[in-house]
Amino acid sequence: MAMTYHLDVVSAEQQMFSGLVQKIQVTGSEGELGIYPGHAPLLTAIKPGMVRIVKQHGEEEYIYLSGGILEVQPNTVTVLSDTAIRGQDLDEARALEAKRKAEDHIRNSHGDVDYAQASAELSKAIAKLRVIELTRKAM
């Protein structure tokens, strides 16, 4: 049996996942993080993107995160996010429309603030589309 640890993924609205996992992959403020059993304690910010969960028996699940906090303790990992959406619950048409609008805003931005905001929105839309793609492949 593979080594595991307990993972909780919680949004402001609900608990998205709670159970034993082999590993997770998430984008932290300093880059990609792979959290395996026995990982050193850690507290870091999470960038908008996804958390890839490899469950106890090897099944994979993808959840979109709007950003948040990752806490790693010896036997428990907690992901806290303002918004967390399961891959199968994401709306591809809305994500594509958000991507198109963000690209338009980038082309028509007037100043650093406009560009930074549009760039952040584009990153979120691309992350949602990536979660949708990976969720389809995993099914």
Swiss-Prot record:
Give start-end of the signal peptide.
Answer: none
Listed under GO cellular component are: plasma membrane; proton-transporting ATP synthase complex
| Subcellular location as annotated | Cell inner membrane
Supply the InterPro entries for this chain: ATP_F1_dsu/esu_C_sf, ATP_synth_F1_dsu/esu, ATP_synth_F1_dsu/esu_N, ATP_synth_F1_esu_C, ATPsynth_dsu/esu_N
* UniProt xrefs under Gene3D superfamilies: ATP synthase delta/epsilon subunit, C-terminal domain (1.20.5.440), F0F1 ATP synthase delta/epsilon subunit, N-terminal (2.60.15.10)
User: Where mainly found?
Assistant: membrane
Q: What is this protein called?
A: ATP synthase epsilon chain
What gene name does this entry carry?
atpC
